Amino acid sequence: MRNEHLAKLTKEELMDLIEIYSKNWLAHDGVWFQSIERKHGMDEAVFHVEEAWKRFTVIEAMRIKEFLHLPENPGLEGLEQALHYRFYGNLNKHECIREGNKLIYRNRDCRVQTARSRKGLPYHPCKSVGIYEYTGFAATIDKRIKCRCLSCYPDCNESPDGCAWEFFIEDSIQNQIQEAKLVQEGLADLVENKTNDGPTVIKNIRENFGL
């Protein structure tokens, strides 16, 4: 179903409307959470938001993946693309940084935490929720991708007003470790043999690792 009224809007108006829709979604997420929090406490509210995010993050990732026409396993490049199109991508100041074979995603200014702080409410202990959210999203984009929390309340290494997550493909990291060990062994063999077998060792290292 398409809303014919949307077709009449300019690009700028559509961008404004997307921001409004995103804020509305986040407002709904917040009001039902606070309703449970007031009646049953923080632990009960966190339980229900975890259950919701387990399902929602997969749905969101699947639709974004289809929209971007990503292949089955698009790697960290595909994940980086998809992260920018999440609802939160329209709400929070965020950045993606590539560090070798890892992708760092950092929320600089989380609307949820800043709003709670502004209202005098305690910070939302969202690390457990974030683990389901980001792990599930990444695995839906590419089943090989793993996720590790770098900073998220209450386990913050950075500002509690944001969070940071590291994504990586486990096989590639294990392969790098194995390759590093093999190179180390080859260099050790080179030193041990000195000039006697040096050219052969160098040749083998170059052939094995494409140097």
Segment roles from a protein language model:
Residues 1-104, 109-129, 136-164, 170-211:
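N-terminal accessory segment detector
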